[in-house]
Amino acid sequence: MINNQYTQLDHETREHDLYAHGKYRLTLKTLERVNLLNGHESKPVLINVGCGGGLFNKLAIEAGFQVFACEPDPTAFELATRFNHPNLKIFLGDISAIQPPVLADVIVCHDVLEHIDAENIALRQIADSLANSGLFVISVPAIDRLFGYHDEQLGHFRRYNKTTLKRILHFDFDAQSVRYYGFFAIPATLYYSRIKKVAYPELISARSGLITWIMKMLISIEVRIAFPVGTSVIAIARKRRVAK
């Protein structure tokens, strides 16, 4: 059962969530590496599925993308629409709410699939909205044994690992890379969410002081180095070409 108050707080604090910022930096580094912004006469199209409060929308626009975003939660949608930009269109609903439909050069899906029971149907919809060989960047929570209070309050159905994520992507995508993120967050996740079954403390969104400095340093390390396990798993995949 989704806790709407908990979910709203999760969206509202995302702007200052250092963990989320690191994940978004990883995504943008990937998009820079594949050179999506070169060779286009116009801005490449990015669809942000489940955009939440809209933080990544801003970052993607700053990076040079034309962004189409969708968000099914009305509260998060309202937060996202507070940011207006000529290169941004936001729709209330899932990816099918984007009208008229667009074919994207890249689709980003941060922490969305775990909310969806019929995950294969959702992935097929995403594949149908990608251009041939389009890029798909997805992050999901990792490690089954960490499933706890945080997951329950947000209405998660599951957590993943590298193997299970690659398996579900296989039907429509070719995985280019799959890595973990959040190694240093494992102790806090285990203690607060799994053992104590309480909300994470406000430390995760701290904005100053020693704790913030330490967190920024650890996240900076994780952006550069993939550890053998973490609280999230992130995949970069290409849509399989459809024969004409």
What are these regions (language model features)?
Residues D111-H115:
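A short His-aromatic
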Residues A185-I214:
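C-terminal helical/coil "lid" or tail adjacent to the Rossmann-like core of SAM-dependent
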